[in-house]
């Protein structure tokens, strides 16, 4: 998390020099991407007049802020580059050196930083911790610093050395009649004690859960249940959750941080590739052999029809529609649903059965391309693949390839098999909101069972699929945009369990993050539909425009920005502007397999309507001002009473009343769980 620093004068000096244009070789190369150039020294050519003016002005500004003089052996160019890197104000852009005629220029890309006097930066620094704290409170997970583990390891090694020294000293003064067997027994007991002490120090967090009745889902083994079997399915991006694998976890996952996602280097940024073993995702359950499909052999019982993943496919289509509307392109013809399933990157190639009919794809990873604040031309390379990202005109080429060693498995009948492992990466939405009135792609199925199938394909947040004997002391992992969250102390878990036990309205929080869909209405007219792939979002209005070096001008993928559009009425425009200005802090929304949870960051009243409260189903409830977690939608209650609303409504500006129509309220937000949005 970036914090305020004392080097803001450096950024102010650079921005003033770039905007004024009074120095030779200093200017914006791409202002939207924050890439600028400064003069570089070419020792083979005669430097033009005024080459050193920029660096002399930089040294003068440095003296004015009380910094010491540079050594005689250092130049202004070297001091400028060193200060940029140490203050983390900019980094070198590749290629670093370009030429303007015969003169050399150095390229830098500015790193966005928070500013003390900027209200938007304050909002940015408030929203991300609020999101993380809400996730910690809901799931009873607290961040774990690796330094604590390193300290525990060093402490255990130090104690081990002390015990070894004491044992040698005792052996030196012992009588010669001591038998070798006794020494071996003493040494064995000492090593067992050391090993036990070390394990107690290293795994105290993982074994410290006490609220087993509330968090028992974190410790139970997954039960295979067809398409939703967590032993064979990856996540529909729960960005915090580890990829489940029947093999041992190879290492922590790496996810782009919000700051990294907003620093493109050119073209479409590369999607994030998770460094995990895909072979582990395809490993069969315990007691089953890994045999490929064949026309003669039986079809495994855990394979279901492709219709089970239709809700997920519709959500992916909606996300791509939202992405294409943001970059100003039309949605291509999707064609047959089979085009949505990508080919595998297998060295043997696809396995064809009789008739060349398509079968089941055991692991599919759909990666919607992230894009910068402005629309870019396609053609950026995909990270880790060495290939260029194709044009968005063909949807099938957008889909990533799997790493299955057998390739796509085929079967008879020409029916498409089930997608057993699907992974979707979050898309970074640009600062400009999508065009009002964007159409939403509907689905063509009616079965309510697909809602459960959609949720079942998402694995639990906190589970390591290791051996049964190692499950009790397994390191509980939980990732959220690159932040490693693990159980830290026992008292913290106890306090969270006690807090949730007192909240009668929140008796179940679930164990899976489920994507959300947000519909935005201004005076009864729908202006935007936001498709989320993270399971946790911050809904807020756009912050005021500022210089591109401000961190508030970056839009992380977990943020849903309300567009600023004009209304036909002058009074309505004024009311809408006032409402959006007061909604800059926003509301945090978390979707799980048990419902939708809200936490308001606002300082003025807001109201929501949902079915979570048994006594106030369909009635207005005020959103708490104390950053308190409130449940707005309950999945189990909706399943028992399906005639109710499928979403939670959030009203801004006016208190909802039955005597007013929708066009009376400035802003109304409908928040859906993705499977309920695509169900009808």
Curated annotation (Swiss-Prot):
InterPro entries the UniProt entry points to: Interferon_reg_fact_DNA-bd_dom, WH-like_DNA-bd_sf, WH_DNA-bd_sf
The family database entries (PROSITE patterns) matched by this protein are listed as: IRF_2 (PS51507)
* DNA-binding region(s) from the entry: 7-103
The compartments listed are: Host nucleus; Host cytoplasm
Q: What is the effect of changing residue 85 to A?
A: About 50% loss of transcriptional regulation and DNA-binding
**Where does the protein principally reside?**
host cell
Which N-terminal residues, if any, form the signal peptide?
none
Record-level GO cellular component terms: host cell cytoplasm; host cell nucleus
Named from the GO MF annotations, one term is: protein serine/threonine kinase inhibitor activity
Per the record, the GO terms for biological process are: symbiont-mediated perturbation of host apoptosis; symbiont-mediated suppression of host cytoplasmic pattern recognition receptor signaling pathway via inhibition of IRF3 activity; symbiont-mediated suppression of host PKR/eIFalpha signaling; symbiont-mediated suppression of host type I interferon-mediated signaling pathway
The Acidic residues compositionally biased stretches are 191-200
Q: Where is the composition biased (Low complexity)?
A: 168-188, 220-240
Q: Which UniProt keywords apply?
A: DNA-binding, Host cytoplasm, Host nucleus, Host-virus interaction, Inhibition of host innate immune response by virus, Inhibition of host interferon signaling pathway by virus, Inhibition of host IRF3 by virus, Inhibition of host PKR by virus, Inhibition of host RLR pathway by virus, Interferon antiviral system evasion, Modulation of host cell apoptosis by virus, Transcription, Transcription regulation, Viral immunoevasion
Task: Tell me the segments the record calls region Disordered.
Answer: 156-201, 220-257, 343-365, 403-423
Q: Main role?
A: DNA-binding transcription factor that plays a role in the modulation of host immune response. Acts by interacting with host EIF2AK2/PKR and inhibiting its activation. In turn, EIF2AK2/PKR substrates including EIF2S1 or histone H2A are not phosphorylated. Inhibits type I interferon signaling by targeting host IRF3 during viral reactivation from latency. Attenuates the transcriptional activity of host FOXO3 via activation of the AKT1 signaling pathway, inhibiting FOXO3-mediated apoptosis.
The entry describes its oligomerization and partners as: Interacts with host EIF2AK2/PKR. Interacts with host USP7.
Q: Which family does it belong to?
A: Belongs to the IRF family.
Question: By what name is this protein known?
Answer: Viral IRF2-like protein
Q: What is the organism lineage in this UniProt record? A: Viruses, Duplodnaviria, Heunggongvirae, Peploviricota, Herviviricetes
Gene field? vIRF-2
